[in-house]
Amino acid sequence: SAASDVYKRQMYMLVGSYATPEEEGIKVYNFDEQNGNSQYISGIKGISNPSFLIPSADGERIYAVGEDSGKSSTANAIKFDKEQKRLTLLNSQPTDGGAPCYITLSPSEKFVLTANYMGGSITVFPLDKDGKLKSETRLISFTGNSLDKERQTQPHLHCIEFTPDHKYLLASDLGTDQIHVFPVSENVTDGVSHSLLNESEEFNIKVESGSGPRHICFHPNQKFAYLINEISGKVIAFSYDKGKLNTIQYIEADTVGAKGSGDIHISPDGKFLYASNRLKADGIAIFSINQEEGTLTKTGSQLTGIHPRNFIISRNGRYLLVACRDSNSIQVFERDSQTGLLKDTGKTIKTNKPVCLKFTF
């Protein structure tokens, strides 16, 4: 059937890492979601610290940050030639904001955006017809601070995600304990300075002081959003409706006060949520989701390698892969679809300082 043919299509795993330009900072593997096996295909050198990336919908372009401090920070456009199994750098542009740590494509794929951690800003890049980054960019800067005297002295933009209805952009700000919300308009024509995001109608959602908002994900039913907070180690559950997030629940993912929570994802069937914790008791907290109410119940945890900054769940929900930065490895866990619990398959991929995993087809 056509459906099973789609599933037979090659599944690629893209890996971003902390790397010098002399190393292959981005690598591509084949991943077989039927058996959890992977095979290295290709890589690309020349980018400093491509620590976060996003593929285009067709998988033929990859956009990656160059997470450096200050002026040397970049956004990078890469061509992925699946026939030749080759990655080629199309072009790079400065972000004008230090330490970009997250990158995303607008729903129409006319723009790429970076969240700049040290810059406390968001950069908007229009794309040309070949998917290259144009040089005329828009920088949106923020102000403020919060409770933690070491980590919240200024804005720290950590994640930017478009809402599933494509009408808003949510930007988590670890430094000010806020989510900035921007109405989105893809077809604005009066120059790049007004493109995509409506700054005049921006509003903010405050979370508890000292939380440290990091990554956001949406439930497949689009009714709920979940935020992992790096400093408090809590997940916040929100109901979502037309740009408005209303708090449902705060629940601990990090139970040892490590202040290093990382990433958050939901299984494709919408039944389980996973959140990673670093610095102490490195691992993944597992929650079941009440899909009517949006509430979470802690159902288990899984120890991982060191510093699980980022992880991903295969499309069929069978495998959860964890980028363990300081173990220099990607662990492959099998996921029990009934209990949500994880089991290490031992099919570990050895690679230097992996910190971002994405699938494309």
Whereabouts are the PLM-identified features?
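A short beta-strand motif characteristic of beta-propeller blades
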Residues: Q39-K45, T88-Q93, G144-E150, S200-K206, ...
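Blade-loop segments of beta-propeller domains
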Residues: Y40-E109
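Short loop/turn segments immediately following beta-strands, especially the blade-tip
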Residues: N30-G36, I78-K85, F125-K134, P183-L196, ...
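An edge-strand/N-cap motif at the start of beta-rich repeat modules
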Residues: K8-D32
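Short loop/turn segments immediately following the C-termini of beta-strands
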Residues: Y18-T20, E67-S69, Y117, L127, ...
